[in-house]
């Protein structure tokens, strides 16, 4: 239990003891305490006096006074109590308890903020999963940044997380990729008799793949058409996935599993799932096609599994894939989809229900659109290539840290304008610069302290930490673990970036309000230890969203 929860629990226990001591109730109802909206009204407040009115048969202000008179303020860490309005009790804490967070943060280091106990739940988080037919773009970048941050947050909160990328390597788009490579391959060999497919891929990368294969694998020209197409499908996916994996690795995004759609066919899982759904009575034949009765589970219409020409819809392998996720022992399935997949939510959830799997185990987040902005105008095309701007170009333009940070600053269900000019600014207007500068500033102060012979470990008396800004800063440090818990519970990566901004802001306010290195050696030791705790917290929070914490800027 983190220090904030410990203090709240102690306060509740002492209020209950006070009610007993005052003889106000034999059975005490739930005591709820909350943080007042206005900090002038204390650290915590409760309405328990009004709740007890009928039980105690007394005026709520009298009840409140009785609770106050019988409260052990020392045990409850309370220095002042006010009774407000009809009987609210406002508690002002003796915030010295907060200093206990300093040695805790220093001792735990890069594990500070992490929950010690496992949740005992396996989470499979699938994100990005872009088709291996071209470059990653800004939508994929947002998916990668949010997905990776969410995986870090869930891990810190005690979940067993598997990060997975689903490779769509079995559909028509891969056939079109193979045909496109085939055309460029023969062109490189001087044979222009092959034409690009109608939905082919015309990018420069396909030309380069064709040239490379013509040089390294010229014997493919002698394969039968069927064997050649199969080889180009395989090689095309390999080339594209190597490029995607490289870009994602540079974007500080890593996966535990790369799951191939083709493997579902090779292992017979699609036929297995189809047979199971038929056996359970959820499929039927109509208009020469095979349908899944998803309307039984709140979908707006039934869905086709096998078209009347005998080919599978995309939905069937998706069902098999999600059933495979369940079979692997995952308790929670989280999918991060692009904005164009909104219509998939109900049908996927319904498909799980056909197997008797609670659809609440599947959580789908939709990543809304991102607009790249420069000088107040939307930038749709690359000045260099004339094509859509790629993840690679974004990394080259603003850097990985800025891209990762900006793309996790907003809830994924909201549209977002990515200001590339702001992301490059070295000023406090740039959120990521502001946060990283706080870390660098702390490192600079710690270096000065060390030069003066003051080590972080030297502090053991924190009673000198009394400045209001210092107390607010410590409250923010103590709030790190609860913030992680909240971000994990709500699957909300942007809660961490919001926290980082608040923590950096509180540090800068403290720095501007009071000298860290003073003539008072004991106070200086306490300050040095405190800002080391802040540095650790800031570094851990930045790492959670995939951003570095520089020691100098």
UniProtKB/Swiss-Prot annotation:
Disulfide pairings: none
Entry's localization field: Cytoplasm
Family matches, as Pfam families: Arg_tRNA_synt_N, DALR_1, tRNA-synt_1d
SUPFAM superfamilies, A to Z: Anticodon-binding domain of a subclass of class I aminoacyl-tRNA synthetases, Arginyl-tRNA synthetase (ArgRS), N-terminal 'additional' domain, Nucleotidylyl transferase
Entry annotated with the keyword Protein biosynthesis: yes
Domain of life: Bacteria
Keyword list, A-Z: Aminoacyl-tRNA synthetase, ATP-binding, Cytoplasm, Ligase, Nucleotide-binding, Protein biosynthesis
Gene Ontology molecular function: any one: ATP binding
UniProt-listed GO biological process terms: arginyl-tRNA aminoacylation
Chief site of localization: cytoplasm
Main enzyme class: ligase
Motif ('HIGH' region): 130-140
Entry EC number(s): 6.1.1.19
Keyword hit for Chloroplast: no
Catalysed reactions listed for this entry: tRNA(Arg) + L-arginine + ATP = L-arginyl-tRNA(Arg) + AMP + diphosphate
One CC-aspect GO term: cytoplasm
Family of the protein in this entry: Belongs to the class-I aminoacyl-tRNA synthetase family.
NCBIfam families assigned to the protein according to its UniProt record, in alphabetical order: argS
Quaternary organization: Monomer.
Protein name per Swiss-Prot or TrEMBL: Arginine--tRNA ligase
Lineage: Bacteria, Bacillati, Bacillota, Bacilli, Bacillales
């Amino acid at each position: 239990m983190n220090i904030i929860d410990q203090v709240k629990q102690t306060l509740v226990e002492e209020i209950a003891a006070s009610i007993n001591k005052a003889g106000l109730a034999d059975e005490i109802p739930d005591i709820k305490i909350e943080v007042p909206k206005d900090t002038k009204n204390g650290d915590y407040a409760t309405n328990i006096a009004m709740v007890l009115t009928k039980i105690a048969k007394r005026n709520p202000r009298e009840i409140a006074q009785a609770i106050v008179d019988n409260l052990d303020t020392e045990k409850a860490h309370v220095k002042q109590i006010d009774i407000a309005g009809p009987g609210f009790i406002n508690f002002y804490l003796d915030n010295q308890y907060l200093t206990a967070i300093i040695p805790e943060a220093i001792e735990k280091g890069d594990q500070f903020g992490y929950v010690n106990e496992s949740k005992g739940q396996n989470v499979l988080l699938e994100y990005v999963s872009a088709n291996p037919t071209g470059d990653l773009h800004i939508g994929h970048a947002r998916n990668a940044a949010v997905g990776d941050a969410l995986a870090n947050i869930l891990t810190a909160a005690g979940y067993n997380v598997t990060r997975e990328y689903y490779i769509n390597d079995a559909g028509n788009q891969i056939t079109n990729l193979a045909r496109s490579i085939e055309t460029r391959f023969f062109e490189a060999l001087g044979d222009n008799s092959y034409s690009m497919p109608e939905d082919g891929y015309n990018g420069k990368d396909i030309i380069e793949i064709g040239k490379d294969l013509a040089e390294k694998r010229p014997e493919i020209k002698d394969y039968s058409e069927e064997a050649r197409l199969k080889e180009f499908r395989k090689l095309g996916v390999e080339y594209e996935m190597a490029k995607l994996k490289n870009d994602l690795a540079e974007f500080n995004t890593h996966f535990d599993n790369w799951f191939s759609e083709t493997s579902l066919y090779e292992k017979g899982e699609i036929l297995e799932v189809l047979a199971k759904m038929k056996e359970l009575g959820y499929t039927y034949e109509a208009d020469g096609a095979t349908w899944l009765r998803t309307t039984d589970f709140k979908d707006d219409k039934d869905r086709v599994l096998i078209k009347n020409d005998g080919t599978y819809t995309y939905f069937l392998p998706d069902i098999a894939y999600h059933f495979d996720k369940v079979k692997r022992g995952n308790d929670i399935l989280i999918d991060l989809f692009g904005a164009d997949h909104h219509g998939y939510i109900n049908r996927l959830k319904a498909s799980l229900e056909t197997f008797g799997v609670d659809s609440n185990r599947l959580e789908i987040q939709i990543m809304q659109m991102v607009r790249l902005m420069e000088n107040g105008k939307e930038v749709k095309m690359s000045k260099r290539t004339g094509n859509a701007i790629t993840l690679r170009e974004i990394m080259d333009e603003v850097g990985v840290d800025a891209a990762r940070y900006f793309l996790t600053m907003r809830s994924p269900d909201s549209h977002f304008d990515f200001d590339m000019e702001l992301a490059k600014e070295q000023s406090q207007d740039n959120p990521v610069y502001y946060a990283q500068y706080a870390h660098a500033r702390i490192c600079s102060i710690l270096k000065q302290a060390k030069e003066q012979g003051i080590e972080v470990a030297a502090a053991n008396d924190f009673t000198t930490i009394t400045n209001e800004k210092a107390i607010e800063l410590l409250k923010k440090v103590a709030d790190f673990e609860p913030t992680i818990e909240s971000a994990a519970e709500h699957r909300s990566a942007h809660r961490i970036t919001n926290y980082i901004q608040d923590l950096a802001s509180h540090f800068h306010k403290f720095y501007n309000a009071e000298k860290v290195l003073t003539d008072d050696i004991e106070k200086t030791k306490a300050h040095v230890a405190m800002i080391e705790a802040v540095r650790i917290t800031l570094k851990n929070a930045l790492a959670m969203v995939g951003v570095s914490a520089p020691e100098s800027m």
